C-alpha cells in the first residue's frame, strides 16, 4: 500500500467566498449571500478562507453595487478566528496593466489593514521581477506572502523549471509557495512528483490550487497529499467541481483516519452547505450559474487549453458566424503560444494568445494583423516571456530587436499614487477610494458617486456590458475584437 510522505494533518483553504463563485457564477455572490454562513464557516477550522481579490473587486462595483473594501471589512468582522486570503496579480494588482511600485505598495498596505492575512501573488509569465514589489510590501506590512508558480505544460515548463522557480521565490522572501494549476492540467502522478521534488528542495509550506474541469482534480489533490503537500484549495460542495475546485467534504472524508486527517468537522460543513445550496440555486435560477460549468470537459486534457477558454472560443466564433473554424482555431492556439514564447494560458496571456489565434484563422492569413495586446506582449511590456519568441513574427508586428523591453517593466513607470490622489480628490473619500479609482477608472467613479444613495442600494446593479474603452473590465476570455 502507498505510504504518505507526511504525517501532518492536511490544511484546507476553502474558496467558497471567492474562486468557487468566480469560476461557476461569474463572481456574482453578494455579501448578503455570505453573511448567514460566516459564523459556521469560522468554526470549521480552515487554514484560511479565500474571499477577496481576483475578479471580486471589479465585480463588486460593476455588477453588485458593493464597495469591495467594505465587503472585506465585513468579512473580517464575521470571521475573527480564520485567516483571510486574497489573489493578487503581482504588478497588475487586480487589474490588467502594470502599476507603479507605490500603487502596488499602497494596495498591499490597505488590503492588510482592512483584514487580509495571506496574499497569493502570481504573474502570468512567471517573471519574478513582476512579483518583487508585492512580495516586499506584503512582508513590510505583516502579511503572509504566498508566491505562486503559474503551472502549465510546454517544452519550457518542466518539473526542473518549477523547482528552480520555487527556490528563487523562497529566496525572495516567500512564506509559502503555491502551485496554481488554473487550467486543471496537473495530473495526479505529475502532482506527486512535483510536490515531492519541491519538498526536497524548499523548506516553506507548499499550497496546491487546482480545478476539476477535466475531472482529475480530486485525484490530483489526493496524490499531492501522499507526496506531502501542506495545504490544498477546495470548495464547499454546493459550488464545487467542474470549473471550480474539488469538493471540500469529499477530501476531508477521504483522509479521515489517515496520517493526513484534516481534523475538520463534516457536520459543520454540512450546515454551511445547506445555506450555499440556496445561494447556488438562486444564481442558477437567475441564469448566472449555468449547469454546463459542472460538466467534465476532457478537451482540456487533449488540447492543454483551459476549459473556460474553450467555451469562450465557441462564443467568439458564433458571433463571427465561423463555428466551422473551431478545430482550426484549437490547432492554431498552441502554434501562437509557441511563437509567443510559451506563455502560461492565464489572464492576461490567455486572452492575448486566444484572440491572436482567432484572428489568424478568421483572416485566412497568419499574423495579418496584431491587436495592441499582442504587440505589447511581444515587446516585453508584460514581462519576460518564458521561451524564445519567433523573431519573424515579432518583426511582422513591427517590433525591432532594439525595441524589446529587457528591464523590469515597472522600472519604466514613475510613481503614480500622488497623481491619482490629485486626480480623484473631488470624488475619493479615502485612500481606498483612490485605489479603486486608479484600478477601475471606468466603473469606480459612478459607483462611488452613487454609493450613499439609497435608491441605488435597492438591488445589485444590472450593469451594462463592458465597453471597448474599458481596459480593466471583468474579462471572460478574449480581448474584444470585431470580426
Predicted segment positions?
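Catalytic cores of alpha/beta
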Residues: 157-169, 214-230
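Terminal or standalone catalytic/regulatory effector modules within metabolic enzymes
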Residues: 36, 42-60, 290, 294-299, ...
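N-terminal amphipathic alpha-helix/helix-capping segment at the start of soluble metabolic enzymes
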Residues: 1-24, 72, 77
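Glycine-rich phosphate-binding active-site loops on the catalytic face of alpha/beta enzymes
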Residues: 121, 181, 227-244
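Active-site beta->alpha loop and helix N-cap motifs at the rims of alpha/beta catalytic domains
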Residues: 53-170, 174-177, 187
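Core active-site phosphate/anionic-ligand binding loop and the adjoining beta-turn-alpha structural block
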Residues: 219, 244, 252-253, 262-322
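Hydrophobic faces of well-ordered beta-strands that scaffold small-molecule active sites
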Residues: 11-19, 47-51, 82-90, 119-120, ...
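Glycine-enriched alpha-helix->loop->beta-strand junction motifs that scaffold or abut catalytic
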Residues: 45, 115-117, 141-143, 171-175, ...
Amino acid at each position: 500500500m502507498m505510504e504518505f510522505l507526511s504525517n501532518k494533518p492536511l490544511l484546507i483553504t476553502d474558496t467558497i467566498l471567492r474562486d468557487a463563485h468566480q469560476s461557476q457564477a461569474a463572481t456574482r455572490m453578494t455579501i448578503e449571500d455570505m453573511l448567514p454562513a460566516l459564523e459556521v464557516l469560522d468554526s470549521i477550522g480552515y487554514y484560511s478562507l479565500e474571499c477577496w481579490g481576483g475578479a471580486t473587486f471589479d465585480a463588486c462595483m460593476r455588477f453588485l453595487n458593493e464597495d469591495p473594501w467594505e465587503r472585506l471589512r465585513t468579512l473580517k468582522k464575521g470571521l475573527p478566528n480564520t485567516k483571510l486570503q486574497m489573489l493578487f496579480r503581482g504588478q497588475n494588482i487586480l487589474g490588467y496593466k502594470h502599476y507603479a511600485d507605490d500603487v502596488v505598495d499602497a494596495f498591499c498596505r490597505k488590503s492588510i489593514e482592512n483584514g487580509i492575512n495571506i496574499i497569493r501573488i502570481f504573474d502570468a509569465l512567471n517573471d519574478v521581477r513582476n512579483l518583487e514589489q508585492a512580495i516586499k510590501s506584503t512582508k513590510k506590512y505583516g502579511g503572509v506572502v504566498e508566491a505562486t508558480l503559474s503551472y502549465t505544460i510546454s517544452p519550457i515548463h518542466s518539473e526542473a523549471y518549477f523547482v528552480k522557480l520555487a527556490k528563487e521565490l523562497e529566496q525572495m522572501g516567500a512564506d509559502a509557495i503555491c502551485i496554481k494549476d488554473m487550467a486543471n492540467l496537473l495530473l495526479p502522478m505529475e502532482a506527486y512528483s512535483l510536490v515531492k521534488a519541491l519538498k526536497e528542495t524548499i523548506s516553506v509550506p507548499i499550497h496546491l490550487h487546482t480545478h476539476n474541469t477535466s475531472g482529475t482534480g480530486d485525484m490530483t489533490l489526493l496524490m499531492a497529499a501522499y507526496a506531502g503537500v501542506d495545504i490544498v484549495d477546495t470548495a464547499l460542495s454546493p459550488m464545487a467541481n467542474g470549473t471550480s475546485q474539488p469538493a471540500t467534504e469529499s477530501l476531508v472524508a477521504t483522509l479521515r483516519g489517515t496520517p493526513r486527517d484534516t481534523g475538520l468537522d463534516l457536520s459543520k460543513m454540512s450546515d454551511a452547505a445547506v445555506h450555499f445550496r440556496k445561494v447556488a440555486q438562486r444564481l442558477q435560477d437567475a441564469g448566472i450559474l449555468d449547469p454546463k460549468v459542472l460538466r467534465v470537459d476532457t478537451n482540456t486534457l487533449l488540447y492543454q487549453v483551459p476549459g473556460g477558454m474553450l467555451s469562450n472560443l465557441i462564443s467568439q466564433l458564433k458571433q463571427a458566424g465561423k463555428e466551422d473554424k473551431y478545430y482550426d482555431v484549437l490547432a492554431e492556439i498552441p502554434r501562437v503560444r509557441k511563437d509567443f514564447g510559451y506563455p502560461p494560458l492565464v489572464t492576461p496571456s490567455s486572452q492575448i494568445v486566444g484572440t491572436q489565434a482567432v484572428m489568424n484563422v478568421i483572416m485566412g492569413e497568419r499574423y495579418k494583423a496584431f491587436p495592441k495586446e499582442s504587440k505589447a506582449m511581444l515587446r516585453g511590456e508584460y514581462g519576460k516571456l518564458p521561451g524564445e519568441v519567433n523573431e519573424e513574427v515579432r518583426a511582422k508586428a513591427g517590433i525591432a530587436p532594439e525595441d524589446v523591453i529587457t528591464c523590469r517593466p515597472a522600472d519604466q513607470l514613475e510613481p503614480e499614487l500622488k497623481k491619482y490622489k490629485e486626480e480623484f480628490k473631488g470624488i475619493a473619500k479615502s485612500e481606498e477610494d483612490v485605489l479603486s479609482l486608479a484600478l477601475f477608472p471606468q466603473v469606480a467613479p459612478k459607483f462611488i458617486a452613487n454609493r450613499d444613495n439609497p435608491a441605488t442600494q435597492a438591488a445589485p446593479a444590472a450593469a451594462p456590458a463592458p465597453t471597448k474603452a474599458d481596459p480593466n473590465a471583468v474579462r471572460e476570455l478574449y480581448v474584444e475584437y470585431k470580426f
